[in-house]
Amino acid sequence: MKMIVGLGNPGQKYAGSKHNMGFMVVDGLAKRLNLTIDKLEFDAATATTRLNGEKIFLVKPQTFMNASGRAVRELMMFYQIQLDEIFVVQDDMDLTLGKLRLRKRGSAGGHNGIKDIISATGSDEFCRLKIGIQHPKRQRVVDWVLTPFSKTDQPLIDDAIEKADDALEDWLNGMPFDQLMNKFN
C-alpha cells in the first residue's frame, strides 16, 4: 500500500495559492492516473486505485494546513498504512522557485502542515517532496503563501509540478528512494 498526501488548504479561496502546491501536484498525478479525488473520508478528499498490484491512495486533507496530521493519522490507522508507505508533498519557502527536494525524514523546517503530521504520527520518518516557492522579499509570509503565483512564474511552476509528478510515478512504480533523490534533487 502507498499513500501520497498533498498539503494545502481547502476551498476556492485558496485554490492556486503557493501554499496549495501539494494539492496541485496530487491533482496532476490524479489526472495522469485518470482518477478523481472526490471521496470524502477522515477529513480528507481521497482517490484510490491499484498499480502494479498495490493499492494506492491519493489524499488531500480537508482540514486547514495546520491540522493536516489528523487526516493522515486517521487514514493510516483505518487502512493500516505504515509510515514508510507515505509520501507527503509540500511547498517550501527556503527553496528557490520551482526547485524540487526529496527527503526521507527530518524536522518540519518551519512548515506547520509537516509539524502537525509529525505530531499526529509521532514520527518524522516519512518521505517528503518539497517544491520551492521561495521566500518573500518584503511581503509578510502569511500573505505570500496564500497568494497565487504570478503569470510570469506560472510556466516554471507548471514544469515543477510535471517533474514532481514524474518523481511520484517513479516511486509508485518501485524506484528506490535513494535513486529518486539522485534523479530529482
Swiss-Prot record:
Pfam families xref list? Pept_tRNA_hydro
Site positions per UniProt: Stabilizes the basic form of H active site to accept a proton:
D91
Q: Where is this site: Discriminates between blocked and unblocked aminoacyl-tRNA?
A: N9
Q: Does the keyword Hydrolase apply?
A: yes
Question: What PROSITE patterns does UniProt report for this protein, alphabetically?
Answer: PEPT_TRNA_HYDROL_2
Q: Which GO terms describe its biological process?
A: protein quality control for misfolded or incompletely synthesized proteins; rescue of stalled ribosome
Residues the record lists as binding tRNA: Y14, F64, N66, N112
The molecular function terms of the Gene Ontology recorded here are: peptidyl-tRNA hydrolase activity; tRNA binding
Give the subcellular location. Cytoplasm
What keywords appear on the UniProt entry? Answer: Cytoplasm, Hydrolase, RNA-binding, tRNA-binding
User: Subunit structure, briefly?
Assistant: Monomer.
Which PANTHER family does this UniProt record tie to the protein?
PEPTIDYL-TRNA HYDROLASE
| Similarity comment | Belongs to the PTH family.
Record's protein name: Peptidyl-tRNA hydrolase
Please tell me the species this chain comes from: Lacticaseibacillus paracasei (strain ATCC 334 / BCRC 17002 / CCUG 31169 / CIP 107868 / KCTC 3260 / NRRL B-441) (Lactobacillus paracasei)
The UniProt gene name for this protein comes to pth
